[in-house]
Amino acid sequence: MAHENVWFSHPRRFGKGSRQCRVCSSHTGLIRKYDLNICRQCFRERASDIGFNKYR
């Protein structure tokens, strides 16, 4: 097998590798609540556009 064929040849169905941010395709810091699937960095940038308000 060539080097390019080895990495990520196994299908990712569950776990952190299977999910990514719908904005920037990052795998880290993912917010899955309410089926957002956005990383926390992108959420902070777009929270008011989505409709989340900060009360405090």
UniProtKB/Swiss-Prot annotation:
- Which Gene3D superfamilies does this UniProt record tie to the protein? 30s Ribosomal Protein S14, Chain N
Q: Which domain of life is it from?
A: Eukaryota
- Which NCBIfam families does this UniProt record tie to the protein? PRK05766.1
Give the family from UniProt. Answer: Belongs to the universal ribosomal protein uS14 family.
Question: Cofactors per UniProt?
Answer: Zn(2+)
Cofactor binding note from Swiss-Prot or TrEMBL: Binds 1 zinc ion per subunit.
Task: Identify the Pfam families for this entry.
Answer: Ribosomal_S14
Protein's UniProt keywords contain Metal-binding: yes
Going by the UniProt record, its keywords in alphabetical order are: Metal-binding, Ribonucleoprotein, Ribosomal protein, Zinc
Name used for this protein in its record: Small ribosomal subunit protein uS14
List the molecular function annotations (GO) for this entry.
structural constituent of ribosome; zinc ion binding
Question: Zinc: is it a keyword of this entry?
Answer: yes
**GO cellular component terms attached to this protein's record:** cytosolic small ribosomal subunit; extracellular region
Q: Which gene encodes it?
A: RPS29
**What taxonomic lineage is listed for the species of origin?**
Eukaryota, Fungi, Dikarya, Ascomycota, Saccharomycotina
**Annotated positions binding Zn(2+):** C21, C24, C39, C42
Q: Which organism is it from?
A: Candida glabrata (strain ATCC 2001 / BCRC 20586 / JCM 3761 / NBRC 0622 / NRRL Y-65 / CBS 138)
BP terms from Gene Ontology: cytoplasmic translation
